[in-house]
Amino acid sequence: MSEINISAVAVKELREKTGAGMMDCKKALIETSGNFEEAIDFLRKKGLAAAAKKAGRIASEGLTAAKVDGLTGVVIEVNSETDFVARNEQFQDLVKEIANLAVIAKTIDTLKTFKMQSGKSVEEEVIENIATIGENLTLRRMDVLEISEGAIGSYVHNEVVPNLGKISVLVGLVSNAKDKAKLEALAKQIAVHVAGNNPQSIDDSSLDQALVERERKVFFEKSKEEGKPDNIIAKMVEGRIRKFFSEVVLLQQNFLFEPKLTVAEVIKNAEKELGAEIKIAKFIRYELGEGIEHEEKNFADEVAAITQG
């Protein structure tokens, strides 16, 4: 049976029966000459039917990874349902290989099409691992950091194996400083700082202004409730905004390794020592599962889920 003879109705029915994707269902029907039951078996053998059923489950565990290649760095997050799978060597190898390809791919859509050592695309390999590992897995996100010159510092917190862990950070320092070792050491220290202090922006001008206005409004209302005069309120609000900046803006935060200095002051000192300008071009901080709504289950539900597979 040729591809043109596969009806949309048959594809739709197979999708409803297996939960697999439309294109996978169409391919299965083509490969099996339109035999419905054989098409189901085809999808099962490929792990696609099982994968689709598991894809409805929330994957908020897993691993983040940081990979640096010269002046390019990438951070990715691959999710699983349980922390147990994150300690699985097969899963770790999958994340490592995806991270290595991500440095070249630059975008997540391109990354999904890249061929892995198995010959399958990244997307296909993730689906196959869903079937073999037995949990929903998701290549959730990636971000790239590229600089023209300087150094990229990387740090992974709570590593399970090198470069894989719960929090992954990259910091790009643009500089023509000759002492690359010292520049790299500074980039690494700032990456550790970012992991621990979770800044929201590099400087106050790049901070989300909606966030600033929301904080300003909260401070204003709070000061007003305290019965302060308007001229005093204005000064109090500005003081609290400055404190807010010192908490969430990277350059204004107290440096983790030298708490008496801000990150900006540490960079200024490094510029004097290295005889070159240093600028933070970008930082990336991925914390595992951030922004994912975790599924709430009671004990009875968990037992039922386990017994039902």
Curated annotation (Swiss-Prot):
Function: Associates with the EF-Tu.GDP complex and induces the exchange of GDP to GTP. It remains bound to the aminoacyl-tRNA.EF-Tu.GTP complex up to the GTP hydrolysis stage on the ribosome.
GO CC term (a single one): cytoplasm
Gene source species: Rickettsia rickettsii (strain Sheila Smith)
Protein family: Belongs to the EF-Ts family.
Keywords per UniProt: Cytoplasm, Elongation factor, Protein biosynthesis
Source taxon at top rank: Bacteria
CDD domains with a match to the protein in the record: UBA_EF-Ts
Subcellular location as annotated: Cytoplasm
GO MF entries: translation elongation factor activity
Source organism phylogeny: Bacteria, Pseudomonadati, Pseudomonadota, Alphaproteobacteria, Rickettsiales
Region (Involved in Mg(2+) ion dislocation from EF-Tu), start-end ranges: 82-85
UniProt xrefs under InterPro entries: EF-Ts_dimer_sf (IPR036402), Transl_elong_EFTs/EF1B (IPR001816), Transl_elong_EFTs/EF1B_dimer (IPR014039), Transl_elong_Ts_CS (IPR018101), UBA-like_sf (IPR009060)
Name recorded for this polypeptide: Elongation factor Ts
NCBIfam families for this protein: tsf
Database matches in Pfam families: EF_TS
